[in-house]
Each structure stands twice: as structure tokens, then as C-alpha cells.
Amino acid sequence: MAPSNLPAIFNPSQQDIEMLLAAQCHLGAKNLQVHMEPYLWKTRPDGVNVINVGKTWEKIVLAARIIVAIDNPADICVISARPYGQRAVLKFAAHTGAVAIAGRFTPGNFTNYITRSFKEPRLIIVTDPRTDAQAIKEASYVNIPVIALCDGDSPTEYVDVAIPTNNKGRHAIGLVWWMLAREVLRLRGTLASREAEWDVMTDLYFYRDPEAEENKDSAGVEEAKVPGADEVGPAAVADGFTSEWEVSGASAGAFTSQAAAATTSWDAEPSTDWAATTGGEAATGEGWGAETTGAQPATQW
């Protein structure tokens, strides 16, 4: 790392440099813009340009001092059309009081006062000058300073402060926004001292895939589901399946009839013949043929 021109109090700690390297903030693109050449450390044999992380830290501190110079935090607009930076700008806005535009930038936000989303910020911060070109172009029309996270191949036209870093990796983008928010809070006095650790983890600024998180949650629910829980209900699951089955609505007569039925065999022969029973009914005149027999005429034809 090159010697820093900052005062001693602004020098990065060893942990800050290690975090920048771990998040691969130093890995730039293979293409190089001429205006980004001063931030280049060297070029690897595979063609990847390595960014000087010391310059990255200097520009983070410079950008934080510019942000703190604005009295009203709501006059600062942070923008990210790149999905990897949308979560980071929302968290940055929540911690510093800025206004976030995550997603598509509506043309005319800074120039067309008729639109409902018209804004007049005093400073804008963008994640990528290439994907956020519309915001930078409109800012140039109304004289709004621009701070941008710039890679080796990023256009720097109308960019006032370029923070050299890898603006294509999810970890690199999240870490730079996290460091920028922490430095702003330090300069504002929200953090007691520069030695005090910020209780917000860097993971909060990292991009998370919604589909992956949803699949992870559904997989966890399936693993935690107890077999047979749908049949017995949640109460039995909570009791650990220790409750006994309840028997209700059975009378004593039901058990008596069952006992009586058990004494006889189902394949036993009946005691009387059905034909004999029919004959008996006919003889007594109680059967269905009794009326026919009694209604016969006295004489036959």
C-alpha cells in the first residue's frame, strides 16, 4: 500500500485493509480507463488490473467528509440500479438519513419538476457510473456533485469524486458502502471514538438472493415438520404425542350386545327353516297369502 497523505487519525487500521482485500475490492476489470490509471497498483499476468486499496481508503474518507459537510442528510441521494448495491444503499440511507433510490432511476427525477418523484438533492452517490448513467447525466444538468464507486473500466465523466473499487462483486460493493456509512457516523460523532467498533455487521450490507432465501426457509420448514402432525393437530405435537385417546358416547348396552353376538358363531345353522316359517304364517292366516285363500269363491269354474 502506498503511503497515505491523510492525517494520522484517518489512517486505516490493519483490519480495514484486510477486509478490503477479503472482499476483493482490489480486483478491477481487465479494461482500463485512462482517468482510472492513477489508482492502479499493477496488472496481473492474466490481465486483471489490481487497484491500490490505500487509494480506496483515502477516497472513502474524502467522500465521508463531503457527506458530513451537508447539514441536512435528506439532501443526499444514494442511487443503485445494480441489484448488488440496492440493499447496501437502503441500509446506508437508514443509518445516515439519506434518501435512497434502489432499482430503476426514473428519468426526470432531477430535471422535470412536474413529476411526482422530483428531487433536488445537494449531493448524489451512485454505485456504478455505467448503470447509473442517467442519474449522473441529469445531475450534470442541475450542477449536483457526484460521488461514484468506480472500477477500472468505469467512465468518469461528470464524476467529481471517484472511489476506486470493484463495483461488480456483491461483497466489495457492500463493504465499501458499510465503510462509508461508518466513517460518516464517526465524523458526525455518533460513534464515540474511532477506536469504538460499530455494532452493525458488514453482512447487513451484502446482497441476498430472495429466491435462495425463500428456498432455504422452505427447506428448514420441511425438515422441522413432524411426520403425522397434519392428522393429529398441533396440540398433540406440542404434548409430544403423550395424551391418551378419549372414548366417549359408548353405552353399556353396546358392550352387552357385542358380548352376546360373540357367543354365537356366524356360520351356525339357523334353528328354523324359512319355508317352515312361511307355511306357518299361511296356516294361521297372518301371511301375505292369507287374504287370497279366504277370498276364493264357493264354486269353481
UniProtKB/Swiss-Prot annotation:
* Disordered: annotated segments: 261-301
Keywords for this protein: Cytoplasm, Ribonucleoprotein, Ribosomal protein
Instruction: Say which domain of life the source belongs to.
Output: Eukaryota
GO CC annotation: cytosolic small ribosomal subunit
SUPFAM superfamilies, per database record: Ribosomal protein S2 (SSF52313)
Q: What is its main location?
A: cytoplasm
One Pfam family of this protein, by short name?
40S_SA_C
Free-text function comment from the UniProt entry: Required for the assembly and/or stability of the 40S ribosomal subunit. Required for the processing of the 20S rRNA-precursor to mature 18S rRNA in a late step of the maturation of 40S ribosomal subunits.
Q: How does it assemble?
A: Component of the small ribosomal subunit. Mature ribosomes consist of a small (40S) and a large (60S) subunit. The 40S subunit contains about 33 different proteins and 1 molecule of RNA (18S). The 60S subunit contains about 49 different proteins and 3 molecules of RNA (25S, 5.8S and 5S). Interacts with RPS21.
* Name of this protein: Small ribosomal subunit protein uS2
Source species:
Phaeosphaeria nodorum (strain SN15 / ATCC MYA-4574 / FGSC 10173)
Q: Which gene encodes it?
A: RPS0
